């Protein structure tokens, strides 16, 4: 299987191959060629190993990534992919590894930090995706409200229950053909992201006998997930700002058999093990990784005065939405986009799409659990059935 790469006068890569798998390998190789330092940094962040070359300032994130079980969750989600999607993602990582071996040495950052490019596993893109989006929902705000309650009292929490009067965020525009001079619909996506160098997106054109798509790819992730144009249909997203992660106040204790957590039915086993974070220019840091029936403990622990666990959909369901990414590339109409997004999970997005037949789509895509309204404000008691997810 062969592939070819052409760069236009703006340096945008146009990749063409004789099969979808060969194209995935070419896209992975191109990501490694153009963004080697970026994707390797994201891999280490997802695995909780970035302090090994970034130093003590990265320990905080590495500790969270390990305690939240980001890499382990990615492995679970990869194991549940359908066979075709798993092969597609695997082909992409093969390309990444080939590209890193060929050209990563050209990136000055590797020489400056002494970092040697590592090996991507088939599940690594899922870990990078999860790590990139784990803070997109509301659990950081819930942690903030816990701090408010501790400092100012429970009555002050309602003062921080909503955003302020100023608006912010991405926007998307979807105009029916009935309101345009051409009679065709207009779609415009306007993502508002932090200014980063390199940017969070990479313009790319992907073509093979099965599809022909141009758009914005996320380096380290196969396909064109967020903003794409596939000849007869186009799609774009904004963050839905949905609340789909919950925090639980846990009661933990050590026993001769390990760690237990107090749940709705009393004391129950929790898993616990230790991991070591290597730190450039510092001493190694030992982290205890504990998980209850609600989710991984991300604040406190068995020996701390309190503990808080994080429950997030991919950890519960083993679904991250990569099956949707492969289907999006093959979309021809807004109905195809709609069906593909039924498999979307993380993060929760607002999606707009339009096609050349005049079709329009505006929907929310992603996994949002059904639970008590109180879960949306702050951490809730793990031992009360009322706060359990109902679906």
Write out the residue ranges for each language-model feature.
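Flexible glycine/proline-enriched surface loops and loop-helix/loop-strand junctions
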Residues: 169, 217-218, 303-309, 316-325
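Sec-exported extracytoplasmic/periplasmic mature domains
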Residues: 97-105, 330, 342-346
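Alpha/propeptide regions of enzymes that mature by internal proteolysis
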Residues: 84, 321-343
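Compact, glycine/acidic-enriched structural inserts
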Residues: 153, 212-283, 325-330
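Short alpha-helical segments and helix-capping/turn motifs at coil-helix boundaries
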Residues: 82, 95, 168-174, 208-226, ...
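Substrate-recognition/specificity elements adjacent to catalytic centers across diverse enzyme folds
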Residues: 2-197, 209, 215-216, 221-224, ...
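Hydrophobic alpha-helical segments
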Residues: 219, 346-391
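Short helix/loop capping segments that flank catalytic or ligand/cofactor-binding pockets
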Residues: 16, 23-26, 183-184, 195-199, ...
């Amino acid at each position: 299987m062969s592939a070819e790469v052409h760069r236009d006068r703006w340096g945008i890569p146009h990749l063409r191959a004789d099969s979808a798998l060969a194209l995935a390998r070419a896209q992975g190789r191109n990501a490694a060629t153009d963004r080697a330092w970026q994707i390797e940094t994201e891999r280490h962040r997802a695995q909780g190993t970035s302090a090994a070359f970034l130093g003590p300032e990265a320990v905080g994130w590495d500790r969270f990534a390990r305690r939240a079980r980001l890499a382990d969750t990615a492995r679970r989600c990869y194991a549940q992919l359908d066979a075709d999607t798993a092969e597609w993602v695997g082909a992409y990582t093969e390309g990444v590894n080939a590209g890193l071996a060929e050209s990563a040495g050209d990136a000055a950052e590797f020489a400056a930090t002494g970092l040697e490019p590592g090996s991507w596993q088939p599940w690594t893109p899922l870990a990078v995706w999860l790590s990139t989006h784990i803070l997109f929902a509301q659990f950081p705000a819930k942690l903030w409200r816990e701090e408010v309650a501790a400092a100012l009292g429970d009555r002050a929490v309602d003062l921080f229950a909503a955003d302020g009067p100023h608006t912010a965020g991405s926007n998307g525009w979807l105009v029916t053909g009935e309101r345009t001079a051409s009679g065709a619909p207009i779609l415009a996506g306007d993502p508002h992201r932090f200014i980063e160098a390199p940017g969070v997106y990479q313009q790319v054109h992907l073509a093979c006998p099965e599809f022909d798509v141009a758009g914005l790819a996320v380096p380290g992730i196969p396909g064109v997930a967020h903003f794409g144009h596939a000849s007869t249909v186009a799609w774009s997203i904004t963050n839905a700002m949905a609340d789909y992660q919950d925090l639980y106040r846990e009661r933990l204790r050590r026993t001769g058999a390990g760690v237990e957590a107090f749940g709705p039915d009393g004391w129950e086993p929790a898993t616990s093990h230790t991991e070591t974070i290597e730190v450039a220019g510092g001493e190694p840091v030992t982290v205890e990784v504990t998980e209850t029936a609600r989710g991984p403990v991300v604040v406190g622990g068995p020996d701390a005065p309190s503990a808080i666990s994080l429950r997030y959909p991919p950890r519960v369901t083993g679904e991250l939405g990569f099956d949707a990414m492969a289907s999006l590339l093959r979309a021809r109409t807004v109905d195809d986009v709609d069906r593909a997004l039924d498999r979307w999970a993380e993060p929760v997005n607002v999606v707009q799409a339009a096609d050349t037949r005049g079709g329009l789509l505006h929907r929310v895509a992603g996994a949002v659990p059904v639970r008590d309204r109180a879960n949306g404000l702050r951490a809730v008691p793990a031992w009360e059935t009322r706060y359990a997810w109902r679906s």
